[in-house]
Amino acid sequence: MISLRIKNTKTFMSHLLVKDTFDNFLLSEADIKTSCSHSIDGQINRAFYSDEEWETLEGDARRYELWLNQKPFCFSLIKGSKVPSSMKIVMLMSTKDTEALLSQIEAGLSTDNINGLFINIRYQEGHADIITGTSLNIFSLDKTLDTAFDSYIKKFLADKGLEFE
């Protein structure tokens, strides 16, 4: 687990809310505080879909919604002349991207052992921070996955031109 302070909040928010930078991540939850509090649970509501629609949903056993699909709604909540007083967005890597990361390391884990590889994005008092986290459904003292995920996020941000400290 690492905590990264984003150096240019405005550029980061553009990547988060306008550009496609984070579109392949899944949304676990979002809390946005403007004139009132808005909370989004990113878990997909199975009852909303017909059986046919459900069958067309792909990947990740469709437990969580893609950020791509919820991003416009979140953006609509905060656009305007005033920034939110605070915002927390929790995302996780897709199963496909998690499998790709696992294939690059020797952690002795499978995606069945992983509840999620998370990034917690927090905006408050004009600053944006990202905190990484891993959740396993088995006990392990091995921190290989944690280290690899932390490195992945640092490289991901750097490749997008998002500076941090």
Region roles according to the model:
Residues 7-10, 19, 33, 71, ...:
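Context-gated lysine
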Residues 1-69:
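Charge-rich, low-complexity N-terminal segments
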Residues 128-165:
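Mixed-charge, glycine-accented linear interaction segment located at domain edges/termini
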Residues 30-34, 43, 110, 138, ...:
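Short, surface-exposed, charged/polar-biased interaction segments
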Residues 59-127:
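Surface-exposed, low-hydrophobicity interaction/linker segments
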Residues 27, 31-32, 37, 96-98, ...:
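Generic "edge-of-domain/loop-turn" microfeature
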